[in-house]
């Protein structure tokens, strides 16, 4: 059975692409009565506030018709930003050589938090280099991952 995020991705991908953007990812954060649906869009030339407004209008109209979320929620449409979330193995592959932070669902070697250079992506396995040592992490065990901006 598909997760809510997967169903929303299937629903929203084509309309976002039709607007000329990439659907970077979706996060649904449950928080009491008012949850938040975050829709990240991207474009090679960056994303403006007007781009977010255009996509938000389209997404909101589509969600009103399809009604895939039965509870109350806030809709946020934004760029993934410089510290963008890495939500798919393809995101890690796009940023090989860059530094990322990773938080695991279940500890590996008594450790849940990692910060290292993305070295390799092999299917569902992500390799980070941390202090000269490679750590291989299963994508399915990643709770959260973000790119660390490089200002050099």
From Swiss-Prot:
Subcellular location, record wording: Cytoplasm
Give the primary localization class: cytoplasm
**InterPro entries named among the record's database cross-references:** Ribosome_maturation_RimP, RimP_C, RimP_C_sf, RimP_N, RimP_N_sf
Q: What are the GO cellular component annotations?
A: cytosol
Q: Give yes or no: UniProt keyword Transferase.
A: no
Say yes or no: keyword ATP-binding present: no
Please list the GO biological process terms of this entry: ribosomal small subunit assembly; translation
* Annotated keywords: Cytoplasm, Ribosome biogenesis
The similarity comment for this entry is: Belongs to the RimP family.
Q: Which PANTHER family does UniProt cross-reference here?
A: RIBOSOME MATURATION FACTOR RIMP (PTHR33867:SF1)
Please give the function described in this protein's UniProt entry: Required for maturation of 30S ribosomal subunits.
Name of the protein this chain belongs to: Ribosome maturation factor RimP
**From what organism does this protein derive?**
Tolumonas auensis (strain DSM 9187 / NBRC 110442 / TA 4)
What high-level taxonomic lineage is stated for the organism? Bacteria, Pseudomonadati, Pseudomonadota, Gammaproteobacteria, Aeromonadales
